[in-house]
A protein has these predicted regions:
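Proline-centered turn/helix-capping motifs that create local helix->coil transitions or kinks
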Residues: 171-179, 266, 321-327
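Coupling/switch/interface segments within P-loop NTPase motor domains and analogous charged loops
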Residues: 134-206
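Conserved helicase NTPase motor core
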Residues: 22, 27-46, 57, 76, ...
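Switch/connector loops and helix/strand junctions flanking conserved nucleotide-binding motifs
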Residues: 85-88, 112-115, 175-176, 277-280, ...
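P-loop NTPase Walker
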Residues: 1-127, 131, 233, 287, ...
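N-terminal helical cap/lid subdomain that shapes the substrate entry/recognition surface
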Residues: 111, 299-300
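Coupling/hinge elements of helicase-like and P-loop NTPase modules
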Residues: 152-162, 302-327
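Short, conserved catalytic or adaptor-binding loops enriched in Gly and charged residues
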Residues: 95-98, 291-297
């Protein structure tokens, strides 16, 4: 497992006396939430199951950082939906003030898009590239599939949806197409050569038409970080505090993006549920959350265990099931 070495934080915080805080954090949060919110410097893993106040914890931590004097734009909040980040920042603004609205928040893809809009020419793209959504990507693959005359009465070729699933999963899991075919589509193994041809032409089509699909946004951001050290350092310096929601649902590419951004200040906090991952079909891996303490030296782990939604009887059943769970 690759281990990222992070430099000591150079972030400077104002020393604020508890009586000077606008928010009474200690009385408004339970002990575990308070620990997570007030643990500011260094890498942190917050284990938070459903109903334990995960969102509340993130909202209060955003407010706490702003109260400590961190410029909102230097805080990066990455979530799985734009709506989630907007709601968290809205709540933080109500909790503290309008400064929280200036926090940099959004999805991994929207963040990648914003960076690549500025630096895409360094990767061989023209400014103003267009983005293919999943439906567009499937249609392009179908066009190539048809032009190659791969689907005949004698031999059925995978539909565009299957082709896209194979291609996207291969990228997001960093796994060879052969391995995915063997595991999930063994009846298509003999067609691997033709599929590889479709994928190669798909990549050529995108480059010829100045297009990126959703997977390219992540791939190209990582490529930018790897090839342009000065730009990676600039962004890693700019974002002094990084928070990631639903970390158990991140894939290998997203985990690497977080690692690159955290190499200067060391202030990376990820929040997730180590017993739940619902996006494995998109390449999400629970290993990201399980391996986080080993990847980030000096990581502090905080567990939010007080549940505000379920009855104790339900929690007892859930805990008994989890005792026998496997990865």
């Amino acid at each position: 497992m690759k281990k990222f070495t992070l430099k000591k934080s150079s972030s400077e915080l104002h020393i604020v006396h508890p009586q000077q805080f606008v928010i009474d954090y200690k009385n408004e949060l339970n002990p575990s939430q308070y620990d997570a919110v007030t643990s500011v410097s260094g890498p942190h893993l917050i284990i938070a199951g459903a109903g334990t106040g995960k969102t509340r914890t993130i909202v209060y931590r955003v407010a706490r950082l702003v109260e400590l004097g961190v410029k909102p734009e230097h805080i990066l909040l990455l979530t799985f939906t734009r709506r989630a980040s907007q709601e968290m920042l809205r709540r933080a603004s109500i909790l503290l003030d309008h400064r929280c609205e200036k926090v940099s928040g959004g999805t991994f893809h929207s963040f990648a898009n914003s960076v690549l809009r500025k630096y895409c020419t360094l990767l061989g793209y023209e400014r103003g590239f267009s983005i293919l959504d999943q439906s567009d990507s499937e249609d392009v693959m179908n066009l190539i599939r048809t032009r190659l005359k791969l689907d005949t009465k004698e031999r059925r070729f995978p539909r565009k949806e299957t082709l896209h699933d194979l291609y996207s999963r291969s990228i997001n899991t960093v796994t060879a197409v052969t391995a995915i075919l063997a595991a999930d589509y063994p009846h298509y193994l003999e067609l691997e050569g033709d599929m590889t041809k479709v994928f190669a032409l798909y990549i050529e089509y995108k480059r010829a038409h100045n297009l990126m699909d959703y997977d390219d946004l992540l791939l190209n951001l990582i490529r930018l970080f790897r090839e342009q050290e000065a730009i990676r350092a600039e962004l890693a310096t700019y974002y002094k505090y990084i928070m990631v929601d639903e970390y158990q649902d991140t894939n290998k590419l997203q985990s690497e993006i977080v690692a690159h951004l955290g190499t200067i200040h060391h202030n990376v906090m990820v929040v997730g549920d180590d017993s739940q991952s619902i996006y494995s079909f998109r390449g999400a891996t629970i290993r990201n959350i399980l391996d986080f303490p080993d990847q980030y030296e000096g990581c502090k782990v905080v567990k939010l265990e007080e549940n505000y939604r379920s009855t104790q009887a339900i929690l007892n059943v859930a805990n008994e099931i989890l005792k026998h769970a496997i990865e």
